[in-house]
Amino acid sequence: MKLSALSLAFAIILMMTIMYTKADADASADAEADADAEAEAIWGALLGTLIPAITSAIQGK
């Protein structure tokens, strides 16, 4: 009986470890994707603002 209780405890700990590791990896991937999307949005806004200003400065307007 002690052996099956020990096996059950080990299985639960193993499952919790796997679930925690997977959740942590998913959260890291989501955070990285959010950071990439934010960087793309910033560069898009920056270039969208600067390119017309630079071209009008070059053209002398």
From Swiss-Prot:
Propeptide residues per the UniProt entry: 24-41
Key word Membrane present: no
InterPro entries tied to this protein: Pilosulin
Maturation and modification: Truncated sequences of this peptide have also been found in the venom. It is possible they have been cleaved in the venom.
Pfam family name, one: Pilosulin
GO cellular component terms listed in the entry, alphabetical order: extracellular region
Main location per the UniProt record: secreted
Glutamine amide modified-residue sites: 59
GO BP of this protein: killing of cells of another organism
Signal sequence range: 1-23
Localization terms from the record: Secreted
Sorted UniProt keywords: Amidation, Cytolysis, Hemolysis, Secreted, Signal
Summary of the tissues where the protein is detected: Expressed by the venom gland.
Stated family: Belongs to the formicidae venom precursor-01 superfamily.
Chain's role: Acidic peptide with potent hemolytic activities (94.8% at 50 uM). It also shows low antimicrobial activities against E.coli (MIC=50uM), as well as histamine-releasing activity (28.3% at 10 uM). Does not have activity against S.aureus, and S.cerevisiae.
Protein name: U-poneritoxin(01)-Om5a
